């Protein structure tokens, strides 16, 4: 028969319980708070990227999403009204028109934004939030 102290409980993960960072890596499913923090990081990143969102005012997540949707629609209108795109829509009859133009320039812009996001100090963005948002 083993004896234990009634004052101290026996724990397998006593080091991780004290916040020493010695624990198995958790997936967002294992740690819902981690997922919440990652989502909050993503909303913060969206707030930074969309120019119509006031930076000095607290806005709800719903407002952020509404601004993001409006911004995407504005970008789509700007893209559709770009002279190169307009000339593609006025092709000679008999030539097939593509319903959409390739997104190569958009993908380049996203790559640039991803590179800018990777320049943030690691204290501000965890690796998990970079994977989800970047």
UniProtKB/Swiss-Prot annotation:
Free-text domain note: The bHLH domain is essential for its repressor activity towards the CLOCK-BMAL1 heterodimer.
Key words, A-Z: Biological rhythms, Cytoplasm, Developmental protein, Nucleus, Phosphoprotein, Repressor, Transcription, Transcription regulation, Ubl conjugation
Record protein name field: DNA-binding protein inhibitor ID-2
Subunit structure: Interacts with GATA4 and NKX2-5. Interacts with NR0B2. Interacts with CLOCK and BMAL1. Interacts with IFI204. Interacts with NEDD9/HEF1. Interacts with ASB4; this interaction promotes ID2 proteasomal degradation.
Matching PROSITE patterns: BHLH
Pfam families the record matches: HLH
The keyword Transferase appears for this protein: no
Subcellular localization(s) per the UniProt record: Cytoplasm; Nucleus
PTM per Swiss-Prot/TrEMBL: Ubiquitinated in a ASB4-depedent manner, leading to proteasomal degradation. Phosphorylated in vitro by CDK1, PKA and PKC.
Cited Gene3D superfamilies: Helix-loop-helix DNA-binding domain (4.10.280.10)
One GO MF term: transmembrane transporter binding
Principal location class: cytoplasm
UniProt GO cellular component terms: cytoplasm; cytosol; euchromatin; nucleus; protein-containing complex
Species in which this protein is naturally found: Bos taurus
Domain bHLH intervals: 23-75
GO-annotated biological processes: adipose tissue development; adult locomotory behavior; astrocyte differentiation; B cell differentiation; bundle of His development; cell maturation; cell morphogenesis involved in neuron differentiation; cellular response to lithium ion
Family annotation (InterPro entries): bHLH_dom (IPR011598), DNA-bd_prot-inh (IPR026052), HLH_DNA-bd_sf (IPR036638)
Location of the motif Nuclear export signal: 106-115
